[in-house]
Amino acid sequence: MKNAYYIGLMSGTSMDGVDAVLVDFSGAQPQLIASHTEAIPSHLLKGLQRLCLPSTDEINRLGRLDRNVGQLFALAVNNLLSKCTIAKEEVIAIGSHGQTVRHMPNLEVGFTLQIGDPNTIATETGIDVIADFRRKDIALGGQGAPLVPAFHQQTFAEVGKKRIILNIGGIANITYLPGNSDQVLGFDTGPGNTLVDAWIQQVKSEPFDRDGEWAASGKTDQGLLMQLLSHPYFSLAYPKSTGRELFNQAWLEQQLSPFNHLDEEDIQSTLLDLTCHSIAQDIIKLSNEGELFVCGGGAFNGQLMQRLAALLPGYKLDTTSALGVDPKWAEGIAFAWLAMRNHLGLPANLPAVTGASREAVLGGRFSAK
């Protein structure tokens, strides 16, 4: 069978780098051919972080960063292809998620905005780009997120197996695969790594809490945990999605103000428990038992995985590597898959997940010619 090569580009709310993957979809399961992470330069990272907060002169900043992020994504593609023997002419298309700078689907006229100019990516790589995947779903009344459950359904579902796929990036989201004719469900549970990353960056100037070691050295404060879990988002019915607009450093500082007597490591432990408890609460609402497979950066946090296992004794816990997909690259592979769906004219959203009025082909194509 002829190879079907696509590239997926993903940079999540953690902004910890641009993941680029080359995937072959010619077989029954996606085959990861090559992978690469392009670091986000500090000046660009600071600009993106500023753009995520309301300020003045946003249009000029947005325009510049849109091009800059497009150039960075193109660099990620070119460096990815330099690692393997696949020529750019063999790649059917790039699926670029872009970098989310606003996600506000619940306004009267909801919107989401990802930057990283696809015209720049196409021009600098010589490969057609498919991008802007989320806004069609929002135009149809949906949340525009999460989009990965459709990929999870095709890749991980098995008849007779009740499975949950948990993606822990900056925000955590779950896909419920019931193993029968029932509807696939999926939604954002709340913070994944975003708050634990923000706190260690603020206190220790470290990018993330490696293996959850700092959290493990602390003791969770139940009063603070209960206050954090009282956020209205956690009691919302699905479909629902969230982002840094709700769970950010400003919100965290506001929540911490009555708890300034706590040790810094105790706060870190409590924030990790916020992630774990909010995930576990939503999973238990779906089913008390089944198989739970984790992907995203959280899959490599041993302390997080231990705490999740303790909260979900009825679940067999593993990473998606047990199903043949490297947890580090799962989301990048999903956006390569979304590019393939667009190229073939096939729908890629699940209305039961996003709340859209119907299925739709997602994304627009930007030619390299």
UniProtKB/Swiss-Prot annotation:
Pathway linked to the protein: Amino-sugar metabolism; 1,6-anhydro-N-acetylmuramate degradation; Cell wall biogenesis; peptidoglycan recycling
E.C. number(s) listed in UniProt: 2.7.1.170
Molecular functions per Gene Ontology: ATP binding; kinase activity; phosphotransferase activity, alcohol group as acceptor
Entry keyword Kinase: yes
Reaction catalysis annotation: 1,6-anhydro-N-acetyl-beta-muramate + ATP + H2O = N-acetyl-D-muramate 6-phosphate + ADP + H(+)
Keyword ATP-binding attached: yes
InterPro entries to which the protein is assigned, alphabetical: Anhydro_N_Ac-Mur_kinase, ATPase_NBD
Keywords per UniProt: ATP-binding, Carbohydrate metabolism, Kinase, Nucleotide-binding, Transferase
Record-level GO BP terms: 1,6-anhydro-N-acetyl-beta-muramic acid catabolic process; amino sugar metabolic process; peptidoglycan turnover
Primary enzyme class: transferase
A Pfam family matched in the record: AnmK
Binding-site residues for ATP, renumbered to this chain: 12-19
HAMAP family assigned: AnhMurNAc_kinase
Role: Catalyzes the specific phosphorylation of 1,6-anhydro-N-acetylmuramic acid (anhMurNAc) with the simultaneous cleavage of the 1,6-anhydro ring, generating MurNAc-6-P. Is required for the utilization of anhMurNAc either imported from the medium or derived from its own cell wall murein, and thus plays a role in cell wall recycling.
Sequence similarity: Belongs to the anhydro-N-acetylmuramic acid kinase family.
The protein's name in its UniProt record: Anhydro-N-acetylmuramic acid kinase
Originating organism: Shewanella baltica (strain OS185)
Encoding gene, per UniProt annotation: anmK
